Amino acid sequence: MAETKTFKVFRFNPQTDKKHRFDTFKVPCRPGMTVLQALNYVQENLDGSLAYRSSCREGICGSCAMHINGKYRLACETQISHLSASITIRPMAHMDIIRDLVVDMTPFFEKLKAIKPYLIPGDPDEGAERIQTQDERAYLDYIVDCILCGACYASCAVNGYDDEYLGPAALAKTNRFLMDSRDKADEQRLALVCDEHGVFRCHTLFNCQTVCPKNVDPTANIANLKRQIIARQLNPGFSKKGI
C-alpha cells in the first residue's frame, strides 16, 4: 500500500496574485518515488495549473532545481523516502518568479556569459591540434561536471544582497577555463572576476559546496581564483602551473 505524504507547494502568479501562498496536496508515494514524480502526480491528477521545470529526469539537465525541505536539490534525484512526512517546496531564490516554482534565470546566464565560458586558445599554427595530456585533463575532472542548475547561485548569501555579484557558478566556470592547459587568456579571465562584484566578494560560507548535485565544489574553485590573482600580484612572472 502506498504511503501518503503531504506536499506544501509554493504558488504565485505575478500577473494575478498580490502575494504568494502555499497549497497543500496529499500524494500517494511508492518506494523509489522522487519529488519530481510527486509534482508530476499533482499536475496530472490534482492541479493542472502547477508550474515547474523538468526535462531529463536523470540529474543531467539541471532544470528541476528547487528548494526542498530547507535545501536546494534536484527534484528528479531527491527520494521522497529520505524526507519527512511533510515536504515543503519553494522556488530558487535571488531570481524573479515567473510562476509557482519557475524562476527567471536570465541574470544567472547573463553572468555566466560575462566571464566568456569558452576556450580562448591563442593563435596556434594553422591546422595544429591543441593537445592535452591525460594529467592535464584529469585536473579538470571535478570542474567540468557543472550542469548549470543554479542551486549554488540560489544558495549564495552574497547573491541575496549584491545583484551584480557574479555568483558561484560563473566563478567556478572561470576557474575551469583558466586551469585548462589549452586556454591562453589567463590575464583576461582574471581581470573579468577581479572587481568589487567578483571573486573577492565571496565570503566562503560553503553554501554552494553543500548544495552542488555534481560535487563541483564552487568554493574550492573560487579559492583557486583568489590564489591565482594574489600570486600574480606578488610575482608577475608566475605561471598557473605553480598552484
Annotated model-derived regions:
Residues F22-T34:
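Short, contiguous acidic and Ser/Thr-rich linear segments
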Residues R57-G59:
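Beta-rich nucleic-acid/ligand-interaction surfaces
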Residues E3-T24:
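Eukaryote-biased recognition of intrinsically disordered, low-complexity regulatory segments
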Residues R53-S54, S63-H67:
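DNA-contacting interfaces and partner/effector-binding or oligomerization modules
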Residues M33-G48, I87-I243:
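Ferredoxin-type iron-sulfur electron-transfer modules in oxidoreductases and energy-metabolism complexes
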